[in-house]
From Swiss-Prot:
Biological-process GO terms, alphabetical: cyclic nucleotide biosynthetic process
Residue ranges annotated for the Guanylate cyclase domain, each copy included: 204-332, 615-744
Residue ranges constituting the BLUF domain according to the UniProt record: 55-148, 467-559
SUPFAM superfamilies, per the entry: Acylphosphatase/BLUF domain-like, Nucleotide cyclase, RNI-like
Compartments, as annotated in UniProt: Cell projection, Cilium, Flagellum
Main location: other
Extra facts: The 1224-5/1F strain is deficient in phototaxis. It is not known if this is due to defective adenylate cyclase activity or defective BLUF domains in this protein.
UniProt similarity note: Belongs to the adenylyl cyclase class-4/guanylyl cyclase family.
Keyword Ribonucleoprotein in record: no
The encoding gene: pacA
Protein name: Photoactivated adenylate cyclase subunit alpha-like protein 1224-5/1F
Organism name: Euglena gracilis
Quaternary structure (record): Heterotetramer of two alpha and two beta subunits.
MF term (GO), any: FAD binding
Length: 1019
């Protein structure tokens, strides 16, 4: 791993290889950067049979620079030197060579592996190292050095192993750039991204728009140059986000979503300013007729609490969830009226440092005339960006003699034998049906989808008599004995001979690697039969391609890994298992079109930009905005993940292709001849939501209110690759892509769960068209719309909102009941309970109630023992919330100290109540730190009330809690013995103290200070 450090150590970024780090430094114009080769992978503290600890395993692939010399003697000479060296430093592992690839696994401590990797990276005998796995391991899996007998020809004559090695290299090098960085790192560490818990975080977020891209798409002279415009936009955004410490969340057509850590707000602002300047320079360098002269950007910067999570499993995506997403998009849209390329929210202004804020104020920082409720927006003097002017430039644009570098071609004009596999045209009548139980198994679903990749479009055009080869991997369902293998060999030999098929079968410790050769019809038929064979499971098709002649001369050449063979080369099973796991994870996040193109033996970067007519689908959760604003992030993730899983399964089962996910919205496309399949997918999605509501009807669960609308439209799109080696996206763009979102939104007004535009019924079957649709009164862009007829396809928005409000009300009431049961509701302490016996929730306060605690009287019978803090927290969490062990540990330590460091410990607001109750028993505290948490105007008074028994408390740190806006909430009457309340980084700090700080010795606000005047912002 390589680390690039610049700006005197203030900016750090990691890379997997040296070439990538050098390219990034050059692209980002970093002049003071230094590159270091280090490794920061955590190690495991448990030893294996040998009792060794702190061991790590690194698996990587490289290409030999001199394959003509790599014979058995050459490898033997390498073995002699490597054995002596690696035994001396304590590193074990193995090499496996198949020209031109070197596959290596090494095990040892972090220090030893770092030393060996540093020497290996400078070895001129191999190049282009690709890490396949890097993570902790328990004990040593291999001997000291398995190199001498690891030459591929010494293991087995089976060419399937060579095929597997080639597929590893092609899959990782071609598909890695399509993965989100988070998913790529998890795959590298051997983790399944689908199994990772959501990660809450506070982030500075932006939404960057390519100005008037829809007008560009509609221009007849510009549609051909869209493959030049989109990659230029992607290549411009990536360096300015990555170079300032940010992360690109995703690209959606001509929109870039990115985020930065909370302390990188100034870097984000500088990066977005530089993006606008660089695009202006790019436009000035273009010749007449170049579409790149029309690339403008506008963006908005906002701050909020969000959750980075994985949603879906058949087609999954990492996405950011939070109510700030819509606000950030609205801020960006507000820049159209302001005629500026960049706006920032009030919260971002709060986080700016003194120097940056003064600089912006000198440049005319002021509040925008409009307002994005409930966010105030600011702008500063910048080069004017008039959208109307840009639109005029686009309409008057004349490409002249300029031609696109990679022009868009009609899909029908491609050669019939080699079309791009943009549609899943697998013959579905031959596919085995999955039971309902299997469909709930994410692994089975994903493997079933991957198996379809063995039949790309390019293979379908060769006829049934085309000679092909197919390699696939499967797991044995039950232990296989030697008698079982003998039976398999006898039966398969006769069957393959009758079908004129040659086959190689490699069996290694429960893992089958099989290669079939023969005519396409015979091979595909046999493969489908083997998929239904109950003796093996989890079938993964790794490779399929046409061949001129077969490699095998026998109907069945079977190699069984005997104990002697495994003793000679133990890593064989590990190698193949790692391939299967990595391939599964990669396919989940990479577009199916790209994977099919790769499985057909092609380079995905050579995909031809095409224009094609499709049936476009878009579905989203109804009334998702109030749900996301009022539910916790965990509940929002549960809703989205459940919904997206159902959508992707329904779409893939009907032959559709899922595009990039957009929050709760799932876009997809179908072939123009599959309009009926698209409608069936819509019906399955709506039916799933109805069944989900019924299943949770009697349970207080957020999934009991999930409803959706689905829109279908028909039109032309372009499909093009965007980006470079650092980040690549497969984009589906077009007017229909934007219009289908409006059709989906029309479902609320029409009262129909499924709405389709007029071109779609023309492509439906007569039965479905004549009896299953009804005209809608509304339309989109002049096109008539129809709703699917039937009571089960009706959408009652009023009932949906009523159910959502009822769920939220019941959830608050349940939370209030829990607090009364465990004695945490203090609103009724010392008095009678409210009428009706229903306790008062602190989140649902009667009119006129304030945060004042002047009526508080301590209970003399209540024991307050600091040693009980940890148990109090755990007890409250066990009654409804998930236990955060790090908080429990800190509370346990605070029982024996005079300070509690609770800064940045909460993952969500539901943990605040248990923490406040635990703080109450820490009566010996002198310093309390609750910075960077969820303290706001509604709960700060209650927090101070919990501190009343702590008579020695002198300093309370509430820094970096932007939810604090009212000075009245911190008047001295709440807790008179608190000497100092630290408020730096909040909205009620003095003007000179708004910069986020980490020190508790600066920017303090004393409780005895007059809290008027300068302690408020001059809005």
């Amino acid at each position: 791993m390589y680390i690039l450090v610049w700006k005197e150590g203030q900016q750090i970024r990691t890379f997997q290889d040296l070439e990538e780090s050098v390219q990034f430094r050059t692209a980002s114009n970093i002049t003071d950067g230094q590159i270091f080769s280090i490794n920061v992978t955590p190690t495991m503290g448990k030893g294996g049979e040998t009792g060794e600890t702190q061991l790590r395993r690194l698996m990587y692939l490289s290409a030999s620079t001199e394959p003509e010399n790599c014979n058995a003697d050459y490898v033997g000479d390498m073995a002699h030197f490597a054995t002596l060296r690696n035994k001396s430093i304590g590193v074990s592992g193995f090499y496996m060579y198949s020209a031109p690839f070197l596959f290596q696994v090494i095990q040892g401590t972090d220090e030893d592996l770092d030393f060996l990797c540093a020497n290996g990276s400078a070895d001129p005998r191999h190049q282009r190292c690709i890490e396949l796995a890097d993570g902790p391991t328990t004990g040593r899996m291999y001997g000291w050095w398995h190199l001498k007998d690891s030459h591929i020809d010494n293991i087995t004559k089976d060419p399937a192993i060579k095929t597997i090695l080639i597929e590893i290299a092609r899959s990782f090098s071609s598909m890695w750039s399509y993965l989100p960085r988070n998913a790529a790192n998890m795959v590298l560490l051997g983790k399944n991204p689908n199994k990772q818990a959501p990660e809450p975080m506070s982030v500075v977020v932006t939404v960057i728009y390519l100005v008037e891209f829809s007008v560009i798409m509609a221009h007849p002279g510009l549609s051909e140059q869209c493959p030049d415009i989109l990659p230029a936009f992607v290549d411009a955004c990536v360096p300015h986000v990555d170079g300032t410490g940010g992360e690109v969340a995703k690209f959606i057509i001509a929109i870039c979503m990115a985020y930065w850590p909370i302390n990188s707000d100034e870097h984000a602002l500088v990066g977005l300013q530089q993006l606008s300047d660089d695009l202006a320079e790019l436009r000035s360098l273009q010749e007449d007729g170049s579409a790149r002269s029309l690339i403008y950007s506008r963006c908005g910067l906002h701050f909020g609490r969000a959750m980075l999570c994985n949603a879906g499993f058949r087609k999954a995506d990492f996405t950011l969830l939070g109510d700030w997403i819509n606000s950030a998009s609205r801020i960006t849209s507000l820049s159209v009226n302001s005629k500026v390329p960049l706006l920032l929210s009030f919260l971002v202004r709060c986080l700016l440092g003194d120097e940056m804020r003064v600089e912006l104020e000198r440049s005319g920082l002021h509040k925008v005339g409009g307002r994005v409720k409930p966010v105030q927006v600011y702008q500063f003097n910048a080069p004017e960006l008039d959208t109307a002017t840009v639109r005029g430039e686009i309409k008057q644009f004349n490409p002249g003699r300029e031609r696109a570098l990679c022009p868009v071609k009609p899909y029908e004009s491609l050669h019939p034998a080699h079309p791009d596999p943009i549609f899943d045209d697998t013959p579905r009548e031959n596919q085995p049906e999955l039971s309902q139980v299997q469909r709930r198994d994410s692994l089975v679903d994903r493997l079933s989808q991957i198996a379809k990749l063995a039949f790309p479009s390019s293979m379908m055009a060769g006829g049934e008599g085309q000679l092909i080869t197919l390699t696939y991997i499967s797991q044995a369902a039950h232990p296989v004995s030697r008698l079982d293998l003998a039976s398999i060999q006898r039966i398969a030999f006769a069957r393959n001979e009758s079908s004129n098929i040659t086959k190689s079968l490699l069996y290694v410790s429960g893992l089958f690697v099989q290669t079939l050769e023969g005519t396409k019809g015979a091979v595909v038929s046999l493969y489908l039969k083997n998929r239904q064979d109950k003796r093996h499971k989890d079938v993964v098709a790794a490779f399929m391609a046409p061949i001129d002649e077969g490699v095998y001369g026998s109907p069945l050449d079977m190699t069984s890994a005997t104990e002697e063979m495994l003793a000679t080369f133990t890593p064989l099973h590990d190698v193949l298992s790692q391939l299967a796991k990595s391939f599964i994870s990669l396919e989940t996040y990479v577009p199916s079109t790209v994977v099919r193109h790769l499985a057909a033996g092609n380079n995905p970067r050579n995909l031809q930009p095409v224009s094609v007519e499709v049936v476009m689908l878009a579905t989203a959760i109804s009334s998702f905005t109030p749900l996301s604003e009022k539910c916790s992030l965990t509940e929002v993730w549960t809703i989205c993940n459940t919904f997206i899983v159902a959508c992707t399964s329904a779409i893939c089962n009907e032959g559709g292709e899922v595009i990039k996910l957009i929050g709760d919205c799932v876009p997809a496309y179908f072939p123009p001849t599959n309009a009926d399949n698209a409608v069936h997918a819509c019906q399955e999605i709506v039916s799933f939501c109805a069944q989900l509501r019924a299943a949770f009807h009697d349970v207080l669960d957020c999934r009991s209110v999930v409803a959706c609308g689905v829109g279908l439209d028909y039109g032309q799109v372009i499909m093009v690759q965007c980006g470079s080696l650092g980040m690549t996206e497969f984009v589906v763009a077009g007017e229909v892509r934007a219009r289908v979102l409006e059709v989906e939104a029309l479902t609320r007004e029409a009262g129909r769960a499924i709405v389709i535009t007029e071109p779609v019924p023309e492509r439906q079957s007569p039965k479905l068209r004549d009896t299953g649709i009804v005209p809608c009164q509304e339309g989109v862009d002049g096109a008539r719309c129809y709703g699917i007829l039937g009571p089960e396809w009706e959408l009652d928005v009023a009932t949906i909102k009523k159910n959502i409000n009822g769920f939220l009300k019941d959830a608050r009431a349940l939370a209030a009941n829990k607090k009364v049961d465990d004695g945490t509701n203090i609103s009724c302490r010392g008095g009678n309970p409210p009428a009706g016996g229903i306790p008062t929730s602190p989140k649902v306060r009667p009119p006129g109630r304030t945060n004042s605690v002047s009526s508080y009287t301590p209970d003399p019978k209540q024991a307050l023992d600091p040693r009980m803090a940890e148990s109090v927290f755990l007890d409250m969490c066990h009654q409804g919330d998930t236990v955060n062990n790090s908080i429990a540990v800190k509370l346990g330590l605070a029982a024996n100290e005079d300070g509690f460091d609770g800064g940045w410990i909460l993952t969500w607001y539901v943990e605040l109540m248990p923490v406040k109750q635990a703080i109450k028993v820490l009566t010996q505290l002198r310093i309390g730190n609750m910075s960077d948490n969820f303290v706001d105007d509604n709960n700060v008074g209650e927090l101070l009330e919990k501190c009343i028994p702590t008579r020695s408390l002198q300093v309370l740190d509430l820094s970096n809690n932007p939810g604090l806006t009212k000075v009245i909430a911190l008047k001295p009457k709440h807790n008179t013995q608190v000497r100092e309340i630290l408020l730096n980084g909040t909205r009620i700090a003095p003007t000179e103290q708004r910069k986020q700080q980490t020190s508790k010795n600066v920017n303090r606000l004393c409780a005895s200070t007059d809290l008027k005047g300068s302690h408020k912002y001059e809005h």
